Amino acid sequence: MGFTNLVSLAALIEKAFPIRYTPAGIPVLDIILKHESWQEENGQQCLVQLEIPARILGRQAEEWQYRQGDCATVEGFLAQKSRRSLMPMLRIQNIKEYKG
């Protein structure tokens, strides 16, 4: 199946965990993103609030320059958190400072 799986989100960096490395030496950075916005749904304004775990791999994880409390725009895709958990996790492919 070739379904589209693209996510773009402006969010607050709620928490950034220490960088770790896979057994193959790939850097991994796990973060928690917090988002709040007003969206239109069925002709009504709806307050959307969420927290979602996110992961950055490779060079971007090593070059991490953001801090807790910073706002960023992230782009990536959703995947299950782990082999044992079907909970969603945002796999970040691009991150940049949010400039409102």
From Swiss-Prot:
The impact of changing E41A is:
3.4-fold higher single-stranded DNA-binding activity
Keyword Transmembrane helix set for record: no
Give the CC-aspect GO terms.
pre-primosome complex
Keyword check for Transcription regulation, yes or no.
no
**Regulation affecting activity:** PriA:PriB complex-catalyzed duplex DNA winding is inhibited by CGS 15943 (CHEBI:131351); PriA is the drug target.
Q: What is the effect of changing K34A?
A: Significantly lower single-stranded DNA-binding activity. No effect on the levels of DNA unwinding activity of PriA
Q: Which UniProt keywords apply?
A: DNA replication, DNA-binding, Primosome
Residue ranges of every copy of the SSB domain listed in the record: 4-99
Identify the SUPFAM superfamilies for this entry: Nucleic acid-binding proteins
Oligomer status and interactors = Homodimer. Component of the replication restart primosome. Primosome assembly occurs via a 'hand-off' mechanism. PriA binds to replication forks, subsequently PriB then DnaT bind; DnaT then displaces ssDNA to generate the helicase loading substrate. Interacts with PriA with high affinity, independent of DNA presence.
Under NCBIfam families, the record lists:
PriB_gamma (TIGR04418)
Q: What does this protein do?
A: Stimulates the DNA unwinding activity of PriA helicase, which does not seem to require single-stranded (ss)DNA-binding by PriB. Activates DNA-dependent ATP hydrolysis catalyzed by PriA. Weakly binds ssDNA. Weakly binds double-stranded (ds)DNA, a partial duplex DNA with a 3' ssDNA overhang, and a forked DNA structure with fully duplex leading and lagging strand arms in vitro. Involved in the restart of stalled replication forks, which reloads the replicative helicase on sites other than the origin of replication; the PriA-PriB pathway is the major replication restart pathway. During primosome assembly it facilitates complex formation between PriA and DnaT on DNA; stabilizes PriA on DNA. Stimulates the DNA unwinding activity of PriA helicase.
| Family membership | Belongs to the PriB family.
What name does UniProt use for this protein? Replication restart protein PriB
Q: Which organism is it from?
A: Neisseria gonorrhoeae (strain ATCC 700825 / FA 1090)
